[in-house]
Amino acid sequence: MDVNPTLLFLKVPAQNAISTTFPYTGDPPYSHGTGTGYTMDTVNRTHQYSEKGKWTTNTETGAPQLNPIDGPLPENHEPSGYAQTDCVLEAMAFLEESHPGIFENSCLETMEVVQQTRVDKLTQGRQTYDWTLNRNQPAATALANTIEVFRSNDLTANESGRLIDFLKDVMESMDKEEMEITTHFQRKRRIRDNMTKKMVTQRTIGKKKQRLNKKSYLIRALTLNTMTKDAERGKLKRRAIATPGMQIRGFVYFVETLARSICEKLEQSGLPVGGNEKKAKLANVVRKMMTNSQDTELSFTITGDNTKWNENQNPRMFLAMITYITRNQPDWFRNVLSIAPIMFSNKMARLGKGYMFESKSMKLRTQIPAEMLANIDLKYFNESTRKKIEKIRPLLIDGTASLSPGMMMGMFNMLSTVLGVSILNLGQKRYTKTTYWWDGLQSSDDFALIVNAPNHEGIQAGVDRFYRTCKLVGINMSKKKSYINRTGTFEFTSFFYRYGFVANFSMELPSFGVSGINESADMSIGVTVIKNNMINNDLGPATAQMALQLFIKDYRYTYRCHRGDTQIQTRRSFELKKLWEQTRSKAGLLVSDGGPNLYNIRNLHIPEVCLKWELMDEDYQGRLCNPLNPFVSHKEIESVNNAVVMPAHGPAKSMEYDAVATTHSWIPKRNRSILNTSQRGILEDEQMYQKCCNLFEKFFPSSSYRRPVGISSMVEAMVSRARIDARIDFESGRIKKEEFAEIMKICSTIEELRRQK
């Protein structure tokens, strides 16, 4: 019998069915090919929104720049980036008036952070534009390369290990007449293979020195590399995102630290909190508006959408905000914070890989790199691409486009939230001076606006005033995409509110299933996801039990570990059957060893090894948890690990799960194909970097880890630490005199070698 799906909804209130309309099952769409077109779209759109601004030329790089600040007031509803400085400053002043001391206190907190942050803060994050190689790299490698180049150019402040000192080097590097960098390149040769007698291509990796003059270096330092945003659901078109280089990152980090500190103190800010904490914060604002509007007032809520938030923001505006927020602070602090927006006002967008052409008839493919777009004949391109290139040409320098207005995605989320909240703050009656008033929530570009007034005309007037006030600071509320409802029903950052937040369970669908890390982690993550959804997302007991059974089934198929007494044949069944037969207590076998599943919704919080430990045969325990087992490259045993789970909205989030290290916690080896490419030198650097860091961690285990401050190098820190530890161990009798003498001798040798170097 076929089920008519509409019957499912007869008893379900509409708001609970919202999650079924979300595009969150199945694989998300990924982008293929280059992001060049999307980046050109972004650059062209951004300039279009600010087209009535003033054009100037950057004296250092020769880049043409458009400045829309204090431009004409809008005459229509088209999105525009003409923020008015005095309006922004006034909004800041009122925000401070409503929250006395907020800026002062946040500045003090940030100053402390600035003085304590180590440069390794910049190793967090994934792909980063590496200006030395002119392409993306893992953050740690990009930082190492930058520091290496700085040191070879006599910039050595960074050796203290403080981020602020590294930033001093960045500032100095911009004044240098030239910078010398080392680039990797590869040579290909055709040679005959001795064994097979076939011709093969041999690749060798070389390093060569290259000098960049001031202009070229500045362009690279100000460059944001662009990529296509992947796995974005519910969109027809892809869009470009940016990744800045190491010169910009440190400055951005400090600005965002200040803005985060301010956001934490603002009740309307949806950042930096998340999850249940965010829901509680939002519910408070709604409660406030509803209690005040009980009998006399109407209350309406707009589920807001802003048109092209980033592309209408302007770094010059952020500079004005920072100047105001830090106005009573010491000069060095104000200078450090103002550099990020200044660099963004002079930013260059790298256009990515360029275009790929193929000729069907001749079976030829050729890549047109972005550098060539400035002067290639446009007859090869289709109509829409031709228009894009024509428009962007005046802005091109060395394959990058000058992009002064606009912010690029995700750079100043916190600071732009402060700007948004400052407009929400103006809705208090003491500022509106009429019968209507508003409040709301802001989280980066997403907002919800609650307007109260005695009648419908008042509501309309309030919304209009909010809309116009936003226009004055470069925020464009979209009239097409925002909708208004009686307060009590709205959506904000994919949380649906209907007299309380409705669980939007479909959001979590992508994180169910087998992660593919290893047998041990996958089992743990799988049950933790189910447990967390029972706690946070209204996953009921029956559904959870079903999810668990599906997960175990999925897990067994993934790792081919069906129960030892099953009829299913896989490559592993022979071994698993043998194990099953020789095990006395079969309940003690892990699921990944063909054992039964003992999980139910009551014991999801217990790691499987612990759940079954008492049931295991002794020799099985010995094999399973044996750090000397030669077949396992062991991770050090940590009680809690972090997994990356993919919820449906927002970035991948980190989720803690209990980790018990067993022979199932293996780490897959790296794919060898990378070893034959030009990445090889980089890979070796990365491994060396990793080894040094691991060694350092051995000397300073996190429990006793007070970072050495003021010691000039890692080696010296480790040597002095080794001496102290050795003396303590010798005096307490833990090591013999000979061992103590040997350690001291090694330490002296290391110091001697450093002196000779």
From Swiss-Prot:
Polar residues bias locations: 55-64
Gene Ontology cellular component terms for the protein in this record: host cell cytoplasm; host cell nucleus
Alphabetical list of InterPro entries matching this protein: RNA-dir_pol_NSvirus (IPR007099), RNA_pol_PB1_influenza (IPR001407)
Domain of life: Viruses
Keyword check for Nucleotidyltransferase: yes
UniProt keyword annotation of Nucleotidyltransferase present: yes
Post-translation changes: Phosphorylated by host PRKCA.
Residue numbers spanned by region Disordered: 50-81
Ranges in coiled-coil conformation: none
Residue window of motif Nuclear localization signal: 187-195, 203-216
Molecular function via GO: nucleotide binding; RNA binding; RNA-directed RNA polymerase activity
Pfam families in UniProt: Flu_PB1
Annotated compartments: Host nucleus; Host cytoplasm
Enzyme Commission number: 2.7.7.48
Stretches assigned to the RdRp catalytic domain: 286-483
Catalytic reaction equation(s): RNA(n) + a ribonucleoside 5'-triphosphate = RNA(n+1) + diphosphate
Alphabetical UniProt keywords: Eukaryotic host gene expression shutoff by virus, Eukaryotic host transcription shutoff by virus, Host cytoplasm, Host gene expression shutoff by virus, Host nucleus, Host-virus interaction, Inhibition of host RNA polymerase II by virus, Nucleotide-binding, Nucleotidyltransferase, Phosphoprotein, RNA-directed RNA polymerase, Transferase, Viral RNA replication, Viral transcription
Chain residue ranges for the region called Promoter-binding site: 249-256
Top EC class, one word: transferase
Biological process annotations from GO: DNA-templated transcription; symbiont-mediated suppression of host gene expression; symbiont-mediated suppression of host mRNA transcription via inhibition of RNA polymerase II activity; viral RNA genome replication; viral transcription
Its biological purpose: RNA-dependent RNA polymerase which is responsible for replication and transcription of virus RNA segments. The transcription of viral mRNAs occurs by a unique mechanism called cap-snatching. 5' methylated caps of cellular mRNAs are cleaved after 10-13 nucleotides by PA. In turn, these short capped RNAs are used as primers by PB1 for transcription of viral mRNAs. During virus replication, PB1 initiates RNA synthesis and copy vRNA into complementary RNA (cRNA) which in turn serves as a template for the production of more vRNAs.
Assigned protein family: Belongs to the influenza viruses polymerase PB1 family.
HAMAP family reported in the protein's UniProt record: INFV_RDRP
Quaternary organization: Influenza RNA polymerase is composed of three subunits: PB1, PB2 and PA. Interacts (via N-terminus) with PA (via C-terminus). Interacts (via C-terminus) with PB2 (via N-terminus); this interaction is essential for transcription initiation.
Protein name: RNA-directed RNA polymerase catalytic subunit
